[in-house]
Every structure is written in structure tokens, then in C-alpha cells.
Amino acid sequence: MENKFPKNVRQIGNVSDSPKIYVEDYVDTFFLQLSEKSEKEKQPEGAFLIGEMQKQDNEEYIYIYGAIKIKELKKEGGEYLINDKIWKCGCEECSQYFEEGEIIGWFVTEHDLQLAPGSINVKLHKKLFPKKNTVLVMKDSTNQEDVFFVHKLGDLIEIGGHYTYYEKNPCMQNYMIASRKKNGAVQTENVEDTAAQSFRSLVRE
């Protein structure tokens, strides 16, 4: 993103917290697809988040411009199970679709999800993402409510709000088309048109 702030931006919630989180609209659309699939099948779904972190004028920013589906995400005793095989697969797909991308967190969604990670998943996050300001997004597929958490101060701290932004994003668009074919995600005739129309309608509200 080369230290350029997105132009087409929509604020969601209270964004006074730090770091500031920006989520590209294709990614937000993909979250919705996974959430709808999770609600329909009553199984957890998840994704690794692709993005970058920046610092400007003493303020920290996180840009999430991609997401890779976590293969066969399972949950046992309240803990999400992400083994070495799943992690390796995520890294390989990140390299395939987002050549210079970095995995900076994860997203989970399921039916009637309690929007708090719990100590067992905080521990998992620290193992997978020890870096400061890595992100966990939790989305209840029942009511579509979501909460963002950031790894700082030795814990996962809830962030009160974030921004969504829209820009040309061929890498995520191509991944979504491929994912739709492989994983049976919600069908759309044109991923680009759907994301653009969704964002424009939200901005008008």
C-alpha cells in the first residue's frame, strides 16, 4: 500500500483505538461467504488473514487485503485445531495468490459463537502469531456480528471499530473465484461486481 491511505473508506464502530484496522471489501465479502456457509452447515469456518502493518506519525495501521480459507477447521473442547499441515497449506496458498503477502492473523466464524477467544485460543494465537498487532476476527454466523482483537500487551485486546475500504484487488478476486469452485462457497456470478455493489450500497446508507 506504500503508505497511502485508502480513498474509498467506510467507518464501522468506534475507531479511536490503536492500531487502526482497514479491511478491503473483497475480504469482507469473503468473510460473509464463509459465515453463511458455516451457518448453513453448522460447522466452524475460518481463514488466514493476509496483509501488512505500517507506522506513520506515531500511529499504527493494519491493512488486511487478503484471506485464505483454513482447510477443514475443527474445534475441540473450545479450542480451534490448526496443525502444521493446515498451517503449511495456508502458507502455500498465500504464496500462490499473494506473492508478497504476509499472514498477519486469522478469522473464525460459527453458529452462536461467543465473541471472546478464551484463554485456550489466546494461547493458540500467540503460538501461531507471536508478532505484535496480529489480528483475530470472530464472527457469529447466526446474527453476523463480528469483533476484532489485536495481539498487544501480552493478550488479545478487543478493538472497538475498524474501516472497510474498496479498491481494485485482483489477487483476492482471483482467490475468491478459485475458492468458490473448490470449496462450494456461496455462488456469485461476478465477484468483482458483487463486492463493488456491496460497498457502494453500504457507503450510501
Could you describe each region identified by the protein language model?
Residues 1-105, 111-195, 205:
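N-terminal beta-strand/alpha-helix entry module and adjacent surface
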